[in-house]
Amino acid sequence: MTREIKVGIGDYAVGKGEGIISTYGLGSCVGITLYDRVTKVGGLLHALLPEAARYGHRGNPAKYVDTGLQLLLKEVLKLGASKFRLEAKLFGGAQMFQNIKSDELKIGERNVQTAKRELKKLGIRLVAEDTGGRGGRTIYLDLSTGKVRMRKVIGGQVIEKVY
């Protein structure tokens, strides 16, 4: 039986070789995976908000895209990943409330923008994404392959894709 590590909101997990790392209920939050195909080291971050500084660095650093991504990177490198081989995949960032006009409240969009900016700053390639829209997502990172299975519910219809 395959071991599954479940990642909650504002948390992350890393692993090597075998098993699944998953997170459920990505709405405006983003799920970011990092994976090294050679060492089969990977990790997943479930971030709630874009930038720690904007919120006074309050609470758990994994709650924020910018500081959480740094934590995730540090941990996959500790397990033997090479920064130069890492590939990132990005999910979530939905607009959960339809009539929001304020950019300040478009958390999903800001989470996605921050994730892309931080990945670029760190020199990590973004190789796949499924972001935006209105549906919630669940993702499963397979540590043996680096593939991410995504389930999305839109208007009662379940859509599954592998990235």
Curated annotation (Swiss-Prot):
Function summary: Probably deamidates glutamine residues to glutamate on methyl-accepting chemotaxis receptors (MCPs), playing an important role in chemotaxis.
Keyword Hydrolase listed: yes
GO BP: chemotaxis
InterPro entries referenced in this protein's UniProt entry, alphabetically: CheD-like_sf, Chemorcpt_Glu_NH3ase_CheD, Cytotoxic_necrot_fac-like_cat
Name by which UniProt lists this protein: Probable chemoreceptor glutamine deamidase CheD
Lineage of producing organism: Archaea, Methanobacteriati, Methanobacteriota, Thermococci, Thermococcales
UniProt KW keywords: Chemotaxis, Hydrolase
S-S bonds: none
Family under the similarity heading: Belongs to the CheD family.
Species of provenance: Pyrococcus abyssi (strain GE5 / Orsay)
Extent of the signal sequence: none
Catalytic reaction list: L-glutaminyl-[protein] + H2O = L-glutamyl-[protein] + NH4(+)
SUPFAM superfamilies: CNF1/YfiH-like putative cysteine hydrolases (SSF64438)
Enzyme class: hydrolase
Gene Ontology molecular function: any one: protein-glutamine glutaminase activity
Keyword Hydrolase among record annotations: yes
